[in-house]
Structures are given as structure tokens and as C-alpha cells.
Swiss-Prot record:
List of catalytic residues: E134
Residues binding Fe cation: C91, H133, H137
Catalytic activity: N-terminal N-formyl-L-methionyl-[peptide] + H2O = N-terminal L-methionyl-[peptide] + formate
Similarity annotation: Belongs to the polypeptide deformylase family.
Organism: Vibrio cholerae serotype O1 (strain ATCC 39315 / El Tor Inaba N16961)
NCBIfam families linked to this entry: pept_deformyl (TIGR00079), PRK00150.1-3 (NF001159)
Protein name in UniProt: Peptide deformylase 1
Cofactor: Fe(2+)
GO MF annotation terms: metal ion binding; peptide deformylase activity
Length: 169
């Protein structure tokens, strides 16, 4: 397994709309394993393939406190949304930034697992929010898109400044 490089805002590749996985192959399973390793190494609770410059509909999530209950969602689809919720969200692709984002309180999701078997589940609380956040990535959308242009530009400028500083090292 490998830790993959996580793209950071405002990288245009984060705006790519992911394509469906046509067949779950050993190569797709390797991508899933690498994404899980990357998510754990970066101390995230979710990761979409577009964040690691792989433009296929793959998401990994683990919201467990013990970090040993990974979920794999291939070609995920939200088939129902209920209620309203929102928490202050962060993102591995927008380091250091957090913002309150309106989300559905509960979702029903259909996806394939790492073996290509279809399954469906209901999610609420943090899992529902995480699923919606990661599926936004697959559509080329970031949580900063929910913010005002002023706030979004402040975050962009801050991250560009950090990037320039790191490049000088």
C-alpha cells in the first residue's frame, strides 16, 4: 500500500467530475487500499478519489474512534435525503480551514463495496455529513463552495501563501 499525495485547494484537478467505476478489478481494490492508507496517514475521516488525482467514483470513510471500521463506497449514490443539519467541516484538501455547511440530517446511500457487491445503508449524524462531503468531491465541489466569495478567497489566499512559503524552503 502507498500513501498518495492529497491535492489542495485551489488545484483545478479537484474540480474534475469523477467517472463511474465500470468494474471492480484488483487495480481498483489497490486504489481503495492506497486511499485508506492515505486517509489514516493524514488523520482524515473520509477521502474521495478526486482528492488524490484519481477521477473515479470511489470514497473511503472511517468515522470510528478506533479507526478500524473502514467503509468503501464505489459508485456511491444518495438515493434519499431527510431533514437538515450541519457542522463545522474541515477537509484534507483545504488544510486549516473550517466552515459550517448545511447538509441533510439523514441520507440513504447505495454503493458497491471493495468486492463489487451492491449494498445500501442509512446514515445520520457525522456519517451522513461525511458521505455528503465526499460525494461533493466526486462532483468537483468543495465545502468552500458553500461559503461567500470573500471567505472562499481568504482561504485561497492563505493556502497559496503557505504553498509559496513551503516552495522557498
Amino acid at each position: 500500500m502507498s500513501v498518495l499525495q492529497v491535492l489542495t485547494f485551489p488545484d483545478d484537478r479537484l474540480r474534475t467530475v469523477a467517472k463511474p467505476v465500470e468494474q471492480v478489478t484488483p487495480e481498483i481494490q489497490q486504489i481503495v487500499d492506497d486511499m485508506l492508507e492515505t486517509m489514516y496517514a493524514e488523520e482524515g475521516i473520509g477521502l474521495a478519489a478526486t482528492q488524490v488525482d484519481i477521477h473515479q467514483r470511489i470514497v473511503v470513510i472511517d468515522i470510528s474512534e478506533t479507526r478500524d471500521q473502514p467503509m468503501v463506497l464505489i459508485n456511491p449514490e444518495i438515493i434519499e435525503k431527510r431533514g437538515e443539519d450541519g457542522i463545522e467541516e474541515g477537509c484534507l484538501s483545504v488544510p486549516g480551514a473550517r466552515a459550517l455547511v448545511p447538509r441533510a440530517a439523514e441520507v440513504t446511500v447505495k454503493a458497491l463495496d471493495r468486492n463489487g457487491q451492491e449494498y445500501q445503508f442509512d446514515a445520520d449524524d457525522l456519517l451522513a455529513i461525511c458521505v455528503q462531503h465526499e460525494l461533493d468531491h466526486l462532483a468537483g465541489k468543495l465545502f468552500v463552495d458553500y461559503l461567500s466569495p470573500l471567505k472562499r478567497n481568504r482561504i485561497k489566499e492563505k493556502l497559496e501563501k503557505i504553498k509559496r512559503f513551503n516552495e522557498k524552503k
